[in-house]
Amino acid sequence: MKKIGVILSGCGVYDGSEIHEAVLTLLAISRSGAQAVCFAPDKQQVDVINHLTGEAMTETRNVLIEAARITRGEIRPLAQADAAELDALIVPGGFGAAKNLSNFASLGSECTVDRELKALAQAMHQAGKPLGFMCIAPAMLPKIFDFPLRLTIGTDIDTAEVLEEMGAEHVPCPVDDIVVDEDNKIVTTPAYMLAQNIAEAASGIDKLVSRVLVLAE
C-alpha cells in the first residue's frame, strides 16, 4: 500500500488548512487504496481568525493540535516526516499554507517556506517521488526549488504575476483540472482559489490525487 504524506497547516480556511480540501484529499487517497500519513508543524499559528466574523482573535493556537481535529488525532509533527517512508507528498491549501507553512500572505515574492517542509519536499523530489500542491499552496514551490516549475493557482492574475516574478511558469487552469510538470513530477490544481462549492473543489482534487498516485508507480 502506497503511503502518501499529507501536510496540514491548522484547521480552517482563514488561519489553517482549508478543511474541505484536506478532507477531500484524505478521501481520494483512501478510495484509491493508498494510505494517508498526516503531518503538521508543531508551532504556534501566525494568527487565529474567528471563522464566523472573519475577525482576528487574541488567543493563540498550535498548528499541529489544530490540524489533529481534521485527522481524528492521527497526525505527527512535521519534523518526524521521512521522505524514505513516503511514496508521494500532497499539500492542501487554506491561508495556513501562506501563513504557517510559509509567509507568502505577508511577504509575497519575498517569502520563505517552513524549513521542515522545504527539506522534506526537496528530499522527495531528489528521490523521484511526486508532489501535489493545491489552492494557494503552489505559491511555495518557487521558494522550495531553485529551478523553473510549471504550476497553477487557477486564474487569479495578481497572484499569477507574483509567482512569475518568483520564477515559476504559471499556467491558467479551471477548477476541475490539473497542471502537471511532468519533468519534476509536480501536480497542482486551483481548488478553492476558484471553487464555488465543495463539489467543484473535489473535481480537481480527485484528479490531482489520481495523477500523483500514477506518478508514484
Curated annotation (Swiss-Prot):
Catalytic function, reaction form: glyoxal + H2O = glycolate + H(+)
Coiled-coil residues: none
EC number: 4.2.1.-
Described function: Displays glyoxalase activity, catalyzing the conversion of glyoxal to glycolate. However, this apparent glyoxalase activity may reflect a protein deglycase activity, which could be the primary function of this protein like other DJ-1 superfamily members such as PARK7, YajL, YhbO and HchA. Is not able to use methylglyoxal as substrate.
Family: Belongs to the peptidase C56 family.
Subunit structure as annotated in this protein's UniProt entry: Homodimer.
Protein name per the record: Glyoxalase ElbB
Organism: Escherichia coli (strain K12)
Source taxonomy: Bacteria, Pseudomonadati, Pseudomonadota, Gammaproteobacteria, Enterobacterales
